[in-house]
Amino acid sequence: MFFTNGVLFSALLPRYPEIKAHFGLSDTQFGLTVVAFAAGAICAAAAAAPMIRRWGATRVTWVGSIVLATTMAVAGGSPSAWVFAAALFAAGLTDAIVDAAQNVAGIAVEKSYGRSIINSLHAVWSLGAATGGVIGAVSAALDVGIGVQMVVNGTVWSIAALVASRLVTSGAAAQPVVDAPAATAAAEAGSPRAWRLLAPLVLLAICGTLIEDIANNWSVLFMRDETTAPVAVAGLAVSVMIGAQFVGRLLGDRMTDRWGREGVARAGGVLIGLGMVVAATSPTAAVALVGFALAGFGSATLVPAAFAAADRVPGLSPGTGVAMLGWLMRLGFLVTSPCVGALSDATDLRVALAIPVGAGVVAAVIAHLASRRRHAARADVVPGDMLEP
């Protein structure tokens, strides 16, 4: 399910330069257009947790995957920028619900296993996203129509999502999570203690997803416009960045067990900053790809760690902490692309990549402060429990 979620959306990303050129959008206009996806996700705020509680995480995931595939197909075949933005809005709304549901299902399976697997599950998402990037890049190189590509892509992976949901063996993932009334969920979401505990997790997750946003919306354009890479090579930027993230997540559980979540997150923030500096100052496409790979690897464990910690926030019913984090971290998407686009128009795209450099610094600082606070309090927390309530 994590794989199909990654591939359904990312297959369109290598075609963004074609879409931008077709509609005649400036960098600022393009940034404001693609932010529709994040705006849709924000509007899903109140929907995810009640749906998961009522119908169960796996059912919400596979039904949502079919809807996501449909909206992405509409985006690929859009006749105008307005239709494209509307389709992305609907896709973002659906994706936020699917994302929360698949994480609730994944955490339920993790609990039944009795060991950490959340980084590995997110690694599978990254593999799916990288696969989608390759599909889009190859389709662009072969001059396959964008609409045709997205219809075929959506059909294949919707079926795969349905099959995968049937294979989930954890009853906690398949069944309704809890029969909590809506008023209780609303009270939980408004709890000052819950917000205080979730705030650093949200900021950390935003730093991680910001790198994904750069990969999704700007890496291909950067490769084409700033390094003059051909379309097929430029399209690989998404796959390289997300592929490196996949490797980092594949190793994430092992690294976390050895160095702790704070240590891994701190190193990840440093790699994000270093990688984006390398990419922004790169003289060639090859060097830029190296920088994107470093940033992708550095961002690998930030979001999984935040989700795992959000599920343990005391006082919240199952699924609520994850749903709240999944919604709030998308607030970053509302400002990332518009800011990158505006700064790029005012200067150039190389300068605009200073924004993700800052995200790396923030992630490293959050992890460092969390580690200092834990040690200062001499809390009885096992290694790997980052920002534990």
Where are the model-predicted features located?
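Primarily marks hydrophobic transmembrane alpha-helices of the MFS/SLC 12-helix fold
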Residues: T58-T61, S65, A265, L353
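Helix-to-loop junctions at the C-terminal end of transmembrane segments
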Residues: A44-A57, A140, G248-R261, S344-D345
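Short amphipathic helix-loop junctions that connect adjacent transmembrane helices
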Residues: L13-T28, N217-V233
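Helix-loop-helix hairpin linking two adjacent transmembrane segments in secondary transporters
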Residues: L121-A172
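Interfacial helix-cap and linker-helix signal at transmembrane-aqueous boundaries
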Residues: I19-K20, M51-I52, V138-D143, M223-R224, ...
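Helix-breaking motifs and short loop linkers at transmembrane-helix boundaries and internal kinks
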Residues: G24, G56, G77-W82, T228, ...
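A late C-terminal transmembrane helix in Major Facilitator Superfamily
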Residues: L316-L349, P356
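Intracellular juxtamembrane helix-capping segments at the cytosolic ends
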Residues: I97-S112, T301-P314
